[in-house]
Amino acid sequence: MDRLLYSFKTVFGNGFLKYFKEQDKKHKYLKLDDYQKVIQRFIEDEQLFRTNYYSGTHVHFTRFLFVSIENFKNNDRTINFTELDHKDKLIWQLEHIIPKSKFEPGDSDKNKLGNLTLLHRDTNVKISDENFVEKKKVLLDKDESKFYINEVFREDNFEKSDIDKRSSDLINDLGKIINDNFDVYCKRVLDIEYKNFEDDF
C-alpha cells in the first residue's frame, strides 16, 4: 500500500494524505485486499451523508474528486494541482460557481459539490463574488476554461436549480472512472500500474 499512499501525496497533496490516514484509522481502508476496493470504500463513506463539500476537512475529498476526474479526462494536459506558493498555500483552490453571497444563511445548496470547481488562485481572486455570466467572461481567456470540470462555464447560464444535476453528474463521472476504468485511472492519474498492485501484499 506504500505506493498508493505515495501517489496520493504526489497527486493530491499532503493535506489529502493526512486526511485519508485519519479516515483510515476509523474505517481500516488499508486492510482491504486491493487498491480499487480501498478507493471505492473511501468514496462510498465520504458520500454517505455529505451535503457540505467545502468546509473544514471536507475540502480534501472534494479536491480528490475534482483532480481525479480532471486528470483522467484530460490526460494530455498535465496540471500540478498540488503546486504551492512561497507561503506553502495551494495555488489551485475550490471556488463557488454561484457566489456564496447569493445564498441565504443555512442554504445547503451553497456548498454542494455541484456548486464548486477548481480554479487558479489568481483567477479566483478576480471573480470570487461575481455572478455566473461575469465569471464566464473572465474564464474565456484562462486555461481553466478548457478543464472538463469547468464545462459548466460553456453553458449560457447556471442557476441554483442546476446544482443537484451537476453534483450527480460529477459523482457519476467518478463512479465510472473508479468502477469501470480503474486500470486506466491508475496509469493516468496515479501514475502506477494496477496489475502490479498485488505485489505489495
Please place each PLM-identified region on the residue numbering.
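Flexible coil/loop and intrinsically disordered segments
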Residues: 1-201
